[in-house]
Regions:
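Glycine-rich phosphate/pyrophosphate-binding loop and the adjoining helix
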Residues: 143-178
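N-terminal beta1-alpha1-beta2 submodule of the flavodoxin-like/Rossmannoid cofactor-binding fold
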Residues: 1-91, 96-107, 111, 176
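Short histidine/acidic/glycine/proline-rich micro-motifs that form metal-
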Residues: 12-14, 139-142
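Residues at the starts of beta-strands that form the adenosine-phosphate
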Residues: 3-4, 34, 130-132, 164-165
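Short, well-ordered beta-strand core segments
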Residues: 87, 132-133
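Short, conserved loop/helix-junction motifs that constitute active-site signature segments
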Residues: 123-129, 161
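Short, acidic/small-residue loops that bind anionic groups at enzyme active sites
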Residues: 109-125
Length: 178
């Protein structure tokens, strides 16, 4: 049994979404004590900007109030990840890649010194010991096709921040028992 699941939906199709139905079922199958649900379609995230990029490089103790404000949402998203044992992430494919709303989430959680750190031997992810289930949904881009730029990208991001246990469920196969 999983204690906490972070469920991330990003499909614009509402209740008709295959990925949304699958993330709900997979989350339920995990029998979590707690679910954190982040719906990027109904509550979209802003894109990172120059203020955010500059603030993330300032040591926490030296940040101004404006810099803290610029990072506040990012801090919240990272806290949601930190609290979760398992991430269940819907990945509806748009034009061969992830939707912009999910890419905004990726950009906001990928923070040096917070979710990963650089070493002389390369980057090290700081979120080890977590599991992720990616729920892949596409009307025309088969999972693993040479032009599937979505699943490999999201898997790489998760690996980069230390989440190595990544399973991909293809909604075309209706295998939602994960």
């Amino acid at each position: 049994m999983t204690q906490t699941v972070l469920r991330i939906d990003s499909s614009l199709s509402g209740d008709a979404s295959r990925s949304r139905v699958a993330t709900a079922q997979i989350t339920q199958n995990q029998q979590p004590e707690r679910v954190i649900h982040r719906d990027l379609a109904t509550d979209p995230l802003p894109f990172i900007d120059a203020d955010w990029a500059a603030a993330r490089l300032v040591p926490e103790a030296d940040r101004t109030e404006a810099q803290k404000d610029a990072l506040a949402l990012s801090d919240t998203l990272i806290s949601e990840m930190r609290d979760a044992d398992t991430l269940v992430i819907a990945l509806p494919v748009h034009n061969f890649g992830m939707p912009a709303s999910l890419k905004a989430w990726v950009d906001l959680i990928a923070r040096p010194g917070v979710t990963f750190r650089y070493t002389e031997n390369g980057p090290i992810g700081l979120f080890e010991g977590k599991k992720a289930i990616i729920v892949y949904a596409s009307g025309g881009t088969p999972l693993g096709a040479s032009y599937d730029y979505a699943s490999g990208h999201l898997r790489q991001v998760l690996n980069f921040v230390g989440i190595k246990d990544v399973q991909i469920v293809d909604t075309k196969e209706q295998a939602v028992a994960a």
